[in-house]
Design a protein with these regions (language model features):
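Glycine- and other small-residue-rich loops at beta-strand/loop junctions that grip anionic moieties
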Residues: 12, 41, 125-129, 152, ...
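Catalytic cores of alpha/beta
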Residues: 46-55, 108-115, 119, 136-141, ...
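Charge-patterned, long linear interaction tracts outside catalytic cores
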Residues: 204-216
Length: 227
């Protein structure tokens, strides 16, 4: 892992919360600050949620990221707000998800309402990753808590377009297609330095989505003296 403090531990749809908690505990022992995901729609029941939170606390976890997660709920929880209002996260630093470019799974109006509902519980917001700086700047200006801007590690343009389509980052898709149209451009790796330069006066925090490219991201972080 790169020489960073915070390491987010994902819980994919169908994943085992015990495994996510235990991996987080291992990271605590190695000196990291693990931030396990709590995807509401992937949690079976309130008792499972309580057990997941308590297990994380017992293992030394101090911070979590609460998200909606998969499209279809497997239990009683349909939104991140529903697990936030249980009160089980008291005493833990809470991050919530932000979507400056919208989401393919929810309308813009419902997304705005969800943010209003969640924000009283949030210590900070982690955004989806994106490439167009203006939606990020506009989003940050409306928030009352710190915003951790989602960026990618170095990736080929073709890969960025693929992942942008998956998360529904509309502005970023248009940004990529308008700036990188040649076939050779699509094969070149792109790092987020330009984006960081344009938004760093608006935030002190960045959240890196490596998409499996830990080595490349670690190299980029060191070459740019970010760690």
């Amino acid at each position: 892992l790169p020489s960073v403090k915070d390491v987010y531990v994902t819980m994919l749809p169908g994943g085992d919360y015990k495994e996510t908690a235990d991996k987080s505990g291992d990271l605590v022992k190695k000196g990291f600050n693990p931030v396990p995901h709590f995807p509401a729609r992937s949690i079976n029941s309130e008792s499972e949620l309580k057990e997941y939170v308590l297990r994380c606390k017992d293992l030394g976890v101090k911070q979590v990221l609460v998200i909606g997660g998969s499209r279809e709920p497997i239990g009683k929880f349909d939104s991140s707000y529903q697990i936030l209002e249980t009160g089980y996260f008291d005493g833990i630093k809470i991050g919530i998800a932000g979507h400056p470019e919208g989401s393919p799974d929810i309308s813009d109006s419902d997304l705005e309402k969800a943010m209003i509902d969640k924000k009283p519980y949030a210590d900070y917001i982690v955004t989806q990753w994106l490439l167009d700086p203006q939606p990020i700047i506009d989003f940050i200006s409306k928030q009352s808590v710190p915003v951790h801007v989602g960026i990618t590690g170095p990736l080929k343009i073709s890969s960025l377009i693929k992942f942008a389509n998956i998360v529904g980052a509309k502005n970023s898709i248009n940004f990529l297609k308008s700036n990188f149209t040649k076939a050779l451009d699509l094969l070149k790796p792109k790092d987020p330095n330009d984006l960081i330069g344009k938004v760093k006066s608006h935030t002190d925090y960045f959240h890196i989505y490596t998409f499996g490219g830990l080595k490349e991201t670690n190299k980029w972080l060191k070459e740019n003296n970010y760690v």
